[in-house]
Amino acid sequence: MPVVLNEKKQAEYIIEKGEVGNKPTSTLFLLAKYYRQKENLNKEQTFNKLNEFMEKNYKNYNSATWEDIIEDISKKANKYPLREIDYIEITKSEIDTIRNVCNIKYEKLLFTMLCYAKLYNKISDKNNGWINTDIKELFRVARVSVKY
C-alpha cells in the first residue's frame, strides 16, 4: 500500500467505493483504525464491520479463513493513531539544496527521502529526520533504477 497522508479520507473513500485493493490486510487495518478511532466502535463492532465489508466487496470471501486476521486487526487498531496529514511542507531552501547535486537521479532520490523524513517527523516527535523505509521502496517511489 502506498504512503497515505490522510488515512481518514482514504478510509472514507474505501468505504464509499468498496475497494479492497491489492493488499486486503492493509485495507482492513486502515478501516479498523477508522472504525475504532473515528466511529468509536469497540473490538467486536469493528470485527463485525470489517467482516461485513469483506463479504460485500471481496470476491470468494471465506469468513473462516479471515476470522483470526480480522480479530487481530480489530484488537490492534487503537494502538496506532489514524493519520490526518494534509500536506508535507518543503521549503525553497531544501529544494535548492537538492538541486545543487546536479544529477537528476540523485535529486529524485533525495527529494523522496526528504518527504519521507518530514512525514515521519510529523508522525512522531521522537523521529528527528530518520527514514525507516526499505531502500527498494525509496527507489521505487523516486522512480529511479540502479544498474550494477
Give the location of each predicted region.
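Modules that initiate DNA replication and primer synthesis
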Residues: 1-148
